[in-house]
């Protein structure tokens, strides 16, 4: 199994699939916002940024997947973004399941002054909703819970890919006597 993931990470198609899946999920988020008129909250915006990190990791890995530098850089960026996204989604689920006046998200995002994404791209990163509101659900789970599952999947996948990198490749053929 590890050799499969190592082989997949050494090819461009696996990285492009990672980037494509993140892009599709970003487009789905925009459909929910503009097509279904759901209002994104601060945590939703942060989760979009984390998903953008996974998209960026897929692009980095696709640049030169046979190079260990670009491969490891893509894995580390993707794993960091997916773990951060998982932690953000976990906090978002906590806001929804335990609403209280002292358990609320901030109204405005706290981006660095050198990277104010909410001012540069307000159509993507401007929050207008409340984190504790459940505006949409599917199969009894809120969107934040589905996002938690999504980031857990990305985290597990990228952790397996990272572990597969230290595995030595299989020899081409084995000889009993030399």
From Swiss-Prot:
Which portions of this protein are annotated as coiled-coil regions?
none
Record's keyword annotation contains Cytoplasm: no
Q: Which UniProt keywords apply?
A: Cell inner membrane, Cell membrane, Chaperone, Disulfide bond, Electron transport, Membrane, Oxidoreductase, Redox-active center, Transmembrane, Transmembrane helix, Transport
Q: Where is this protein found?
A: Cell inner membrane
Q: Which residues lie on this side of the membrane: Periplasmic?
A: 32-49, 91-145
What function is annotated for this protein? Required for disulfide bond formation in some periplasmic proteins. Acts by oxidizing the DsbA protein.
| Protein name in UniProt | Disulfide bond formation protein B
Q: What is the lineage of its organism?
A: Bacteria, Pseudomonadati, Pseudomonadota, Gammaproteobacteria, Pasteurellales
Gene name linked to the record: dsbB
């Amino acid at each position: 199994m590890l050799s499969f993931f190592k082989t997949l990470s050494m090819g461009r198609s696996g990285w492009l699939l990672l980037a494509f899946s993140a892009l599709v999920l970003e487009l789905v988020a925009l459909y929910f916002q503009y097509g279904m008129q759901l209002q994104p909250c601060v945590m939703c915006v942060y989760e979009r940024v984390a998903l953008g990190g996974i998209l960026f990791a897929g692009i980095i890995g696709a640049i030169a997947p046979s190079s260990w530098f670009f491969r490891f850089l893509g894995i580390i960026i993707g794993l960091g973004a997916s773990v951060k996204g998982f932690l953000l989604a976990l906090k978002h689920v906590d806001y929804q399941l335990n609403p209280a006046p002292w358990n609320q998200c901030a109204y405005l995002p706290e981006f660095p002054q050198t990277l104010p994404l909410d001012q540069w791209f307000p159509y993507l990163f401007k929050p207008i909703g409340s984190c504790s509101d459940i505006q949409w659900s599917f199969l009894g789970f809120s969107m934040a819970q589905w996002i938690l599952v999504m980031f857990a999947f990305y985290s597990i996948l990228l952790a397996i890919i990272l572990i597969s990198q230290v595995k030595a490749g299989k020899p081409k053929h084995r000889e009993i006597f030399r």
